[in-house]
């Protein structure tokens, strides 16, 4: 499933190609989607190309070919009001209980929105509600939950619709599954690895590509410690 911005950009490119036979410039795309910078357009174009919706033609400036349009899928997504979001301040802090009875009480963990287990999405900052979590699922420190959207981590057992329980942390070890904030704009749930001087954000689905980024573009916002799933 495409995010709202990805779908809007795909439709804009397709309509421009039908009208004039020439794809829009990056400045025109930026203005059409009301984005602040062209870097956001570059990321959206890359995501659409990785998912097989467009193709960039080599040796030709601004040459983009639309391969397919996910009409039904995108329309369904828009009806649901898909608005991915992640992380704000005032995160729920888990404190040691003063008695055995208190230690058995469920802990209210704030749900901070949705996180992409797929192509990175724009990060908004909204707190929606809380969920009750058994205290033995949590360690010390601050915790929050994010609703997973996408299928890029299915081979790690993380499914679309799962609630990811996150321990707030600004660092990670190689192999940890983390909430990564990219360029202070996009957030994604991926496996973290160091590759020399770079950071690799790895999916757990062969349909998605590993993203290699310099450390100054990636901020760790927390580590996955468990999943909360309703049946």
Curated annotation (Swiss-Prot):
GO terms for molecular function: DNA-binding transcription repressor activity; sequence-specific DNA binding; serine-type endopeptidase activity. One of its GO terms (biological process) is DNA replication. Its EC number is 3.4.21.88. The record marks 117-118 as: Cleavage. GO terms for cellular component: protein-DNA complex. Keywords: Autocatalytic cleavage, DNA damage, DNA repair, DNA replication, DNA-binding, Hydrolase, Repressor, SOS response, Transcription, Transcription regulation. InterPro entries: LexA, LexA-like, LexA/Signal_pep-like_sf, LexA_DNA-bd_dom, LexA_repressor, Peptidase_S24_LexA, Peptidase_S24_S26A/B/C, WH-like_DNA-bd_sf. The active site is at residues 152, 190. It comes from the Bacteria. Pfam families: LexA_DNA_bind, Peptidase_S24. Disulfide bonds: none annotated. Residues 26-46 bind DNA. It catalyses: Hydrolysis of Ala-|-Gly bond in repressor LexA. Belongs to the peptidase S24 family. Homodimer. HAMAP family: LexA. Represses a number of genes involved in the response to DNA damage (SOS response), including recA and lexA. In the presence of single-stranded DNA, RecA interacts with LexA causing an autocatalytic cleavage which disrupts the DNA-binding part of LexA, leading to derepression of the SOS regulon and eventually DNA repair. This is LexA repressor. The lineage of its organism: Bacteria, Pseudomonadati, Pseudomonadota, Alphaproteobacteria, Hyphomicrobiales.
